[in-house]
């Protein structure tokens, strides 16, 4: 994919952002510049080093495989081992062996077996089963509640590790699991009250979980943090420790090369010259896509999805922070036509982007057609056209000073959340698992997809509405909710957060067996919701990436794990 190129037309003004007396007033956002520059262009992959790490992984991988299926290992110890394997991002290597063990243990499960088991162990067991699709009943936690009052016993507050396990377990709850709803609120308060008194790894574990529970974090980052903060668990088995370190190094090399490829592509396309008003966020977008799937086999998929998502950034910022309403209408019409002849009707400054967009999609479609999977590219392209129409709708609202009703806003807002474009584009390079049936399932837009899409829309709205409002945008979910239901701003935000919480419960339910599609296809849906949480939980981490995303990029691509 590094070779995928498009010729940029010449004759573009040196700075499309320059405003002369003859130009219209534009809604410029003055986005912060990239903090990375050309830093990632200089990486040079030594393929022999990558191969050495692949070979070195084989021995500890085989040793760990034997441990996972060891019939003499105690069930709690085995579940603890599988938990560490999962937290370290190694599950995909042993899925067959892990499922065979969990099938057996799940069939043998009995509530009576939990009577003498401590809170931490029960929590770990619960998380293992739930993370891997087995609906272990939440009743396992009822023993820690007072029978007369119905509240959690104060005695568990002396077990910080147990509380931490219960808090992480509560993130996996589905609708109607009252014991876990109560646990989430109760334990969060208790952990916040004691975290400042803790020391060492336990302090880091609690801080990490309170900042962002594992289930809602980016898998690659969570794996690295687990390796750093759970030394005892990671070093309990030599094969686990060795494999994790080698795996991290292998992924680091592969992913730095992918980041170099997309950075060079972006630079060669000259977007910063032809559309200088846009957000320059190549490492951030690559990180976002890496959050959907980190496994080595999805290297091509990551490169394709990153490029398409970068197109989306150019489109979004053109509609939102540069183009006039007349220009937006013309560009939307051209994208609907998807034909090079339409280039004459659009403003000169956006013509290079339009040509690159069509050329790149055509080349990706040719590549996928050779594998019999051009349908995934077509689905991505149609989603791109949908979002252009959605952006136009928002622009018309803003131009007319119109505040939509909340249902009206959500109908269009689910499109403009970019969820559909990113999720469909993520499928393009995934290979044979994206069958006709799998694509049809995506198109059917069932509950799990709807939930992830809703999180993508509302988490963004809750964090960005003030910035958008300051820039004269009337199309925000918070404003639509206030207008429709006559509530205060605080009440509107609280209600949207409840909707987000319930959507997480629906995603959790959708990932449990029996599933409609394989977890390979569900994982990007779950992980896209996770990445929305990463980017928007505390601030608009994409527009202003100086905090969380910068920290994560440094951890994965700048710093290096000592070998």
From Swiss-Prot:
GO terms for biological process: diterpenoid biosynthetic process. It comes from Matricaria chamomilla var. recutita. Keywords: Lyase, Magnesium, Manganese, Metal-binding. A motif (DDXXD motif) lies at residues 316-320. GO terms for molecular function: germacrene-A synthase activity; magnesium ion binding. InterPro entries: Isoprenoid_synthase_dom_sf, Terpene_cyclase-like_1_C, Terpene_cyclase_plant_C1, Terpene_synth_N, Terpene_synth_N_sf, Terpene_synthase-like, Terpene_synthase_metal-bd, Terpenoid_cyclase/PrenylTrfase. Its cofactor is Mg(2+); Mn(2+). Sesquiterpene synthase involved in germacrene A biosynthesis. May be involved in the biosynthesis of the sesquiterpene lactone matricine, one of the major active compounds of chamomile flowers. High expression in disk florets, moderate expression in ray florets and detected in leaves and stems, but not in roots. Belongs to the terpene synthase family. Tpsa subfamily. This is Germacrene-A synthase. Pfam families: Terpene_synth, Terpene_synth_C. The Asp-Asp-Xaa-Xaa-Asp/Glu (DDXXD/E) motif is important for the catalytic activity, presumably through binding to Mg(2+). Mg(2+) 1 binds at residues 316, 320. It catalyses: (2E,6E)-farnesyl diphosphate = (+)-(R)-germacrene A + diphosphate. Mg(2+) 2 binds at residues 316, 320. Mg(2+) 3 binds at residues 460, 464, 468. It is an enzyme of class 4 (lyase). Binds 3 Mg(2+) or Mn(2+) ions per subunit.
């Amino acid at each position: 994919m590094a070779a995928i190129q498009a010729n940029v037309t010449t004759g573009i003004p040196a700075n499309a952002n320059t405003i002369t007396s003859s130009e219209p007033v534009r809604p410029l956002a003055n986005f912060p510049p990239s903090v990375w520059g050309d830093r990632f262009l200089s990486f040079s992959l030594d393929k022999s080093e990558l191969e050495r790490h692949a070979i070195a992984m084989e021995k500890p991988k085989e040793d760990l495989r034997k441990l996972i299926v060891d019939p003499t290992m105690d069930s709690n110890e085995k579940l603890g081992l599988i938990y560490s394997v999962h937290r370290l991002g190694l599950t995909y290597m042993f899925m067959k062996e892990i499922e065979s063990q969990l099938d057996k243990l799940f069939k043998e499960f009995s509530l009576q077996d939990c009577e003498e088991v401590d809170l931490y162990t029960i929590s770990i067991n619960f998380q293992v089963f739930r993370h891997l699709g087995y609906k272990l009943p939440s009743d396992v936690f009822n023993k820690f509640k007072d029978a007369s009052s119905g509240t959690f016993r104060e005695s568990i507050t002396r077990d910080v590790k147990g509380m931490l396990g219960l808090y992480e377990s509560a993130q996996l709850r589905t609708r109607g699991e009252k014991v876990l709803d109560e646990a989430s609120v109760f334990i969060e308060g208790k952990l916040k009250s004691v975290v400042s008194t803790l020391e060492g790894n336990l302090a880091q574990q609690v801080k990490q979980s309170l900042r962002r529970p594992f289930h809602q974090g980016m898998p690659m980052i969570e794996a690295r943090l687990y390796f750093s903060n759970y030394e005892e668990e990671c070093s309990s088995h030599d094969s686990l420790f060795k494999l994790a370190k080698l795996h991290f190094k292998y992924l680091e090399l592969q992913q730095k090369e992918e980041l170099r490829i997309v950075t060079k592509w972006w630079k060669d396309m000259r977007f910063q010259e032809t559309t200088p008003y846009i957000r320059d966020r190549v490492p951030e977008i690559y990180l976002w896509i890496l959050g959907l799937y980190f496994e080595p086999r999805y290297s091509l998929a990551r490169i394709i999805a990153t490029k398409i998502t970068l197109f989306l950034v150019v489109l979004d910022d053109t509609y939102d922070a540069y183009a006039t309403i007349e220009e937006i209408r013309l560009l939307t019409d051209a994208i609907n036509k998807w034909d090079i002849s339409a280039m004459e009707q659009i403003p000169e400054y956006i013509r290079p982007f339009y040509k690159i967009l069509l050329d790149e999609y055509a080349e990706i479609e040719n590549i996928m057609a050779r594998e019999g999977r051009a349908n995934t590219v077509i689905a991505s392209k149609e989603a791109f056209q949908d979002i252009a129409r959605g952006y136009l709708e928002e622009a018309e609202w803003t131009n007319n000073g119109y505040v939509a009703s909340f249902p009206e806003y959500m109908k269009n807002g689910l499109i403009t959340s970019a969820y559909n474009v990113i999720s469909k584009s993520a499928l393009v390079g995934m290979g044979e698992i994206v069958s006709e049936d799998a694509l049809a399932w995506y198109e059917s837009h069932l509950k799990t997809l709807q939930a992830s899409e809703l999180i993508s829309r509302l988490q963004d709205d809750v964090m960005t509405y003030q910035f958008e409002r300051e820039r004269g945008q009337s199309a925000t979910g918070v404003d639509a909710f206030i207008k429709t239901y006559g509530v205060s701003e605080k009440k509107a935000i609280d209600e949207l957060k409840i909707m987000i919480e319930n959507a997480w419960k629906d995603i959790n339910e959708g990932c449990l067996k029996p599933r409609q599609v394989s977890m390979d296809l569900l994982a990007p849906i779950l992980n896209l919701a996770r990445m929305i949480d990463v980017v928007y939980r505390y601030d608009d981490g994409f527009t202003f990436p100086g905090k969380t995303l910068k920290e994560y990029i440094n951890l994965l691509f700048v710093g290096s794990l000592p070998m």
